[in-house]
């Protein structure tokens, strides 16, 4: 369930320059469960006569617009959900959130349910009418249609993506049982059209309309990590679940955009899945491998397996749009190997948003917290606590932002707009085989500034969108969770800007200018850790937020609350 919350625009932060955007919270998740302790059956409510209110729905994950209605699907307790193979340890409980894992009531009632999914709850579906400013929950349209439809929704690990095209709204997400679950609505009447499971795929994140055709990017294999496909939607309101494969890629697709008559996609690496089974990076110290202390060798690198930018054939050549014969004709135009000097850390790079702006393609990286650390520990097990701490420190990365023109051509030019000229790299042969970290060149000089727009906790360049002639980049800021909600006191005489809690939204006002901060505090809620999705309506952005703080439900005015938020960013 959700509450409709209509608030005035957030106060503009004190600044000499008033930003050209205004921000308004349109709707907010409401408490949907009562919590009385880890491993305790959930009391009735809310309202909660026993225990405290809990808000499970944490992300606006898939977001689309059909006419004057926004459609979106949510994700519940996303911070607590772990991929297949992940090692779950003890439950987590603090003032902000709880992850019960195998001690949750659903897991205890079903011992066969994996602990990694103990905090799973079914996603919800909503529409928001832009004319009447009315929020309507549509979840029951699915669950009341048939037991099969209800079962598909109940086994969907969040409605991670959404699209609206030719009178059909599609919401899709990975199934906890395998495959991708897709739900369809009539975009004009709102009528529920049905659901299906696409068993050949395991993950789906984004869709794009290019040349009048709707495409989706998917992953294949465990957690989507074995390969990637681009699907062309060939359906309609009568048969909404027909697709054809138009790209066959070595890694799963993250995001898609049209640029100069082609599709470009960003991908995640295979290592993100492999690394999920690595030992815990905070507790692993190994003895020296082998009698002579010979370091372990990293796997041979295949750049096709790294996070990359791939380019399609021209959309206008041959039969309009992309077709099955185009599936093997995509070109890799960039990979993480062109920037990250450490060969193990680069295997954990993922890519996020990308967009066409000013005749150039922009894209950014994503860094799952401690993913590179876990991967590095699995390849080069540390031999002391000091070496473990060095690995933790030197494998952390904030996102970088790049842009390129004439990609794949003889006059190709790629610039690092925000990033580093050097990054730590591990030399396993140093210190007689013990290994050591040292600065290594990335081969670039950033045009405008450091990684994460200068914030080391800005880990994801999660989504990009062009609205009103500006390129917007939404981030995921991990500071609140990493610092456990306690901002450290900067040392005396410090010249660096302290981190802020809450996601950021930045804008490039023109291709020749540095990015400008629109907001760096989660749009007034420091618990909003990420700008998960954005869609464009003219010069207006509609933004879906990620906020996993499921125990932050104090209704006192001015107290930040957990759960998803739907936000409008518009020109003044």
What is each residue range found by the language model?
Residues 76-78, 168, 175-176, 219-222, ...:
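Residue-level signature of beta-propeller blades and closely related beta-rich strand-turn architectures
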Residues 68, 166-168, 211-212, 260-261, ...:
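Short coil/turn segments that connect the beta-strands within blades of beta-propeller domains
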Residues 22-52, 126, 132-154, 196-198, ...:
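Surface-exposed loop and turn segments in beta-propeller and other repeat-based domains
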Residues 41-82, 463:
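Beta-strand-rich domains and repeat architectures in extracellular enzymes and scaffolds
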Residues 465, 472, 530-572:
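Blade-level signature of beta-propeller repeat domains, shared across WD40, Kelch, NHL, RCC1
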Residues 86-133, 180-189, 226-237, 278-321, ...:
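Beta-propeller blade signature
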Residues 59-61, 145-163, 199-211, 248-257, ...:
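Repeated scaffold domains used in trafficking and secretory/extracellular systems
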